[in-house]
């Protein structure tokens, strides 16, 4: 119950992090 809600909150907090890290890195490596 609470674990599922916590999991969603953690996912929302930490899913954008790989995007922010990998995005600029991929963009820099491609150029």
Curated annotation (Swiss-Prot):
Compartments where found: Mitochondrion
GO biological process, one term: amino acid biosynthetic process
Annotated organelle transit peptide span: 1-27
Keyword line: Amino-acid biosynthesis, Aminotransferase, Branched-chain amino acid biosynthesis, Lipid metabolism, Mitochondrion, Pyridoxal phosphate, Transferase, Transit peptide
Catalysed reactions, semicolon-separated: L-leucine + 2-oxoglutarate = 4-methyl-2-oxopentanoate + L-glutamate; L-isoleucine + 2-oxoglutarate = (S)-3-methyl-2-oxopentanoate + L-glutamate; L-valine + 2-oxoglutarate = 3-methyl-2-oxobutanoate + L-glutamate
Required co-factors: pyridoxal 5'-phosphate
Superkingdom as given in the UniProt entry: Eukaryota
Major location (coarse): mitochondrion
Enzyme kind, highest EC tier: transferase
GO cellular component terms given for this protein: mitochondrion
EC numbers on record: 2.6.1.42
Gene Ontology molecular function: L-isoleucine-2-oxoglutarate transaminase activity; L-leucine-2-oxoglutarate transaminase activity; L-valine-2-oxoglutarate transaminase activity
Family of the protein in this entry: Belongs to the class-IV pyridoxal-phosphate-dependent aminotransferase family.
Subunit structure: Homodimer.
Task of the protein: Catalyzes the first reaction in the catabolism of the essential branched chain amino acids leucine, isoleucine, and valine. May also function as a transporter of branched chain alpha-keto acids.
Name used for this protein in its record: Branched-chain-amino-acid aminotransferase, mitochondrial
């Amino acid at each position: 119950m609470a674990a599922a809600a916590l999991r969603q909150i953690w996912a929302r907090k930490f899913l954008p992090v790989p995007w922010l890290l990998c995005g600029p890195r991929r963009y820099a490596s491609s150029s």
